[in-house]
Amino acid sequence: MHKSVLLKEVTDFLSNPCPKIHIDATLGLGGHAKALLEVCKDTFLIGIDKDENAIEIAKEKLKGFNAVFYHGSFKDFDIVLKEEGLLYFDSILFDFGVSSLQLDEEEGFSFQREDFLDMRMDKRQQKTAYIVINTYKEKELADIFYKYGEERLSKKIARSIVEKRKKKPIETTKELVDIVSSCYPYKYSKINPATKVFQALRIEVNSELEDIKIALSKLLDFAKEGSKFAFISFHSLEDRLVKEFIKNNADKLKVCSKKPITPSDEELLYNKRARSAKLRCAKLCYNEKKDEAFDS
């Protein structure tokens, strides 16, 4: 069962005061959206997600609320706003994590299942993890694993993949896990050796970091005085982009806390997938002092 990460913290921040127009740019199964709409009855929600299955589930969950739904990337939030005849939003949420639905279904996101190497969040796109693993050159694979997964054995793993696929295509997550694991000289106790490679593949297949950059580059163009921004990231590459955005706009943004908000010990007891989550939030304030964090 999917549990929305940092649910209380996000809801408390976004609902004080309640937004008239809220964009959940990564709607998922609608957990964050429902929590906000239960508090803010008059809020108009625009929900966007790449995963069509997730949208259908969210629609059911959010029946009776004032909401519209779009199948697409969070980077296109501005196009969606224009389709609704709107010029700006009052608040926006980005949750950059993979949903439990995607991890639990046969989508190739999880190395704990034996699935076909897919990893597409949006099934309309052509590129899959299978295509990346079986057609990219050795150097391209090594660069992806190092850049997006911060994998120190990137070259060795890429070399091994290329050797293996000469005999037969690498088709399943288990095959890939076995190849990556064989490159490690000893067994890792804390994380599966394939964790970083799977992260890198997911980012490459779905253009995740590029989409984040695009979204951040136009965010302020569709915000107004007092508009709120909430970002949930799950690894340093995502968080770094958000930090840079906030830093580069320090003269316009007021952060809700100096450091990112992380899950409480209580949340981690029932939601282990939240352990790496970080929430950064800010509001657009042209006319306020920015030297102190505000209380959400």
UniProtKB/Swiss-Prot annotation:
EC annotation from Swiss-Prot or TrEMBL: 2.1.1.199
Compartmental location: Cytoplasm
Alphabetized InterPro entries for the sequence: RsmH, SAM-dep_MeTrfase_MraW_recog, SAM-dependent_MTases_sf
Enzyme class per UniProt: transferase
Single Gene Ontology BP annotation: rRNA base methylation
Residues annotated to bind S-adenosyl-L-methionine: G30, G31, H32, D49, F77, D95, Q102
Keyword rRNA processing attributed: yes
Gene Ontology MF, one: rRNA (cytosine-N4-)-methyltransferase activity
Record keywords: Cytoplasm, Methyltransferase, rRNA processing, S-adenosyl-L-methionine, Transferase
GO CC terms: cytoplasm
Catalytic activity: cytidine(1402) in 16S rRNA + S-adenosyl-L-methionine = N(4)-methylcytidine(1402) in 16S rRNA + S-adenosyl-L-homocysteine + H(+)
Entry annotated with the keyword rRNA processing: yes
Family stated for the protein in its record: Belongs to the methyltransferase superfamily. RsmH family.
Described purpose of this protein according to its UniProt entry: Specifically methylates the N4 position of cytidine in position 1402 (C1402) of 16S rRNA.
Record protein name field: Ribosomal RNA small subunit methyltransferase H
Chain's gene name: rsmH
